[in-house]
Curated annotation (Swiss-Prot):
The family this protein is said to belong to: Belongs to the TRAFAC class TrmE-Era-EngA-EngB-Septin-like GTPase superfamily. EngB GTPase family.
Its job: Necessary for normal cell division and for the maintenance of normal septation.
Source organism: Bdellovibrio bacteriovorus (strain ATCC 15356 / DSM 50701 / NCIMB 9529 / HD100)
Gene designation: engB
Keywords from the named record: Cell cycle, Cell division, GTP-binding, Magnesium, Metal-binding, Nucleotide-binding, Septation
Name the record gives this protein: Probable GTP-binding protein EngB
Pfam families: MMR_HSR1
Residues holding Mg(2+): 45, 66
Domain EngB-type G: 30-199
Named cofactor requirement(s): Mg(2+)
Residues that bind GTP: 38-45, 64-68, 82-85, 149-152, 178-180
Length: 200
């Protein structure tokens, strides 16, 4: 390959598999899974729709709307798992504990998991919530990449500074700035997923 940029076609087919909360209800298959997590209102649904070029994730003005793990098969190649948003203050203590149990069960036990995309609003700082998900990845040994959404809210120089700031705070090298509005940055994320997590 010689380090050449690989331009990958977007998924041709997208099939909703199922929604689940309990491990016993997770779908049975042998494909690689890529999970996508993010703070409520981080722009996760808009990012997923831009990445797949399909409206598979419901965009809501109400944070914390997604309460289930939603499984989608992309181009018969891998399975994307849309995880419930975290950090929504209006949720009760019981709901937060339920969220934590569901996320921990999936991240720590799912054999098909190949990597986690952590979606953040580019204007927010790295917090203890993000650090917790990083700890899950380190304990289990799966890779973690960060997607900074709403990059159109900044100039390019500000976006690069924000990316550098998150890289430093997180200790991660795979940090991407994207804009669903301008349809920028998603291809780089897709290339990264295929090259590092999906390709045999």
């Amino acid at each position: 390959m010689g380090g050449a940029l690989i331009v990958l076609a977007m998924p041709k087919t997208i099939q909703f598999i199922k929604s689940a909360v309990l491990e016993k209800d997770f779908p049975v298959h042998k494909k690689a899974e890529v999970a996508i997590a993010g703070r409520s209102n981080a722009g996760k649904s808009s990012f997923i729709n831009a990445l797949t070029k399909n409206k598979i994730a419901k965009v809501s003005s109400t944070p914390g709307k997604t309460r289930l793990l939603n499984f989608f098969e992309l181009d018969q190649s891998y399975v994307m798992v849309d995880m419930p948003g975290y950090g929504f203050a209006a949720r009760s203590g019981d709901e937060m504990r339920e969220w934590h149990r569901m996320i921990e069960t999936y991240l720590m036990n799912r054999e098909q998991l190949r990597g986690l995309l952590l979606v953040m609003d580019i204007r927010r700082s790295w917090t203890e919530d993000e650090e917790l998900l990083k700890e899950f990845s380190e304990r289990r040994g799966f890779p973690l990449a960060v997607v900074l959404t709403k990059a159109d809210k900044m100039s390019r120089s500000q976006m690069l500074q924000a990316v550098a700031k998150v890289k430093k705070a997180s200790g991660l090298s795979a940090v991407f700035g994207v804009s669903a509005l301008k349809k920028e940055g998603q291809d780089a994320v897709e290339d990264y997923i295929y090259e590092n997590w999906i390709k045999e």
